Amino acid sequence: MKFIDEAKIYIKAGDGGNGAATFRREKYIPMGGPNGGDGGRGGSIYAVADRNINTLVDYRYTRKFIGKRGENGGGADQYGAGGDDIILRMPVGTVIYNLNTEEIIADLSEHDQKVMIAKGGKGGLGNIHFKSSTNRAPRQKTNGEQGEELELRLELRVLADVGLLGLPNAGKSTLIRAISSARPKVADYPFTTLHPNLGVVRVDDEKSFVMADVPGLIEGAADGAGLGIRFLKHLQRTRILLHLVDIAPIDPDSDPVRDAKAIVGELIKHDPDLANKPRWLVLNKLDLIPEEDREAAVKNFIKAYKKATKYDGPVFPIAAINGEGTKPLIYAISEALEQMARPEIGDLDDNDEDSDEIIRDTE
């Protein structure tokens, strides 16, 4: 299902009602004292995280939300009724920014999390509050305060545990198809993936994790080349990055070690924090190498890559197209995720201004 992951909206909480300036006028009490009640508070606006919502598309069509004004106070000490609050339901993973300052107002990271994003104005005071020993018939009252008014930018960042990195045509979409229920487009040409994809990987009946596939990076991506760099924001909440490398490229001029090193370089240039996440090397397309040559090809690559990058993390040779080697990878990911704490959400890159579409497929 396609969904919008960014929207801009205007919100205005309700103004407070005005206080009343009235006096008791009862039989036999023609000069009664003040009895003007206070105005009601304006309705506030809240954002609530809802795991049953997967998109911000509703906020593309309805962009203005204005809270109800509090009612004015009345005579006989009648206080005005408060304005009704507005509840805006958003997907879990939505980050709410002040559009003008880019300050993060709220980060909806858990289901049913509720955050006030615009406070309703206080009701004005009735003249009953201004009575004193020297002023027994006050005509003073105050008007209600204005409700808060904001322009907001909503950004949905997918909540995936594992993210896939690599050049176009490295086999990322093939891998996510092989081990999850996601069904991204797969073809034998680069740039097949044009939008991020999510897939739920079932380890067993009780364990699963979410994997995100984004369009491939190319050299020069940090300077704007290709599609992948604009989608990297969707990997910021992942806990493990899988760097897929085509170990058997068809192009004789291709150098897998050089290409893999280039991807890491682009990642560091664009987002050093993302580059510092645990990153595992996955050597794909083992099926294209004769069986008797596979072990040597893997050893030679690892030796050259470690020399070029000082990499000392785990390495998983696989053939995504037929599933070879994917089970050890899945179990290793599951075990590592169990030992890791959930990432702190809030320290996010605020420079992404593009609006994207994501394809989410789960079981």
UniProtKB/Swiss-Prot annotation:
CC cofactor: Mg(2+)
Biased composition (Acidic residues): 346-356
Gene Ontology cellular component annotations, sorted alphabetically: cytoplasm
EC number: 3.6.5.-
Keyword set includes Cytoplasm: yes
Domain Obg: 1-159
Annotated localization: Cytoplasm
Region (Disordered): 342-363
UniProt keyword terms in alphabetical order: Cytoplasm, GTP-binding, Hydrolase, Magnesium, Metal-binding, Nucleotide-binding
GO biological process: ribosome biogenesis
Residue stretches making up the OBG-type G domain: 160-338
InterPro entries to which the protein is assigned, alphabetical: G_OBG (IPR031167), GTP-bd (IPR006073), GTP-bd_Obg/CgtA (IPR014100), GTP1-OBG_CS (IPR006074), GTP1_OBG_dom (IPR006169), GTP1_OBG_dom_sf (IPR036726), OBG_GTPase (IPR045086), P-loop_NTPase (IPR027417)
Any one GO MF annotation of this record: GTP binding
Keyword Membrane: no
Residues reported in the UniProt entry to bind Mg(2+): S173, T193
Binding site for GTP: 166-173, 191-195, 213-216, 284-287, 319-321
Record NCBIfam families: Obg_CgtA, PRK12297.1, PRK12299.1
Described function: An essential GTPase which binds GTP, GDP and possibly (p)ppGpp with moderate affinity, with high nucleotide exchange rates and a fairly low GTP hydrolysis rate. Plays a role in control of the cell cycle, stress response, ribosome biogenesis and in those bacteria that undergo differentiation, in morphogenesis control.
Family recorded in the similarity comment: Belongs to the TRAFAC class OBG-HflX-like GTPase superfamily. OBG GTPase family.
Subunit structure comment from the entry: Monomer.
Name under which the protein is recorded: GTPase Obg
Name of the gene this protein is made from: obg
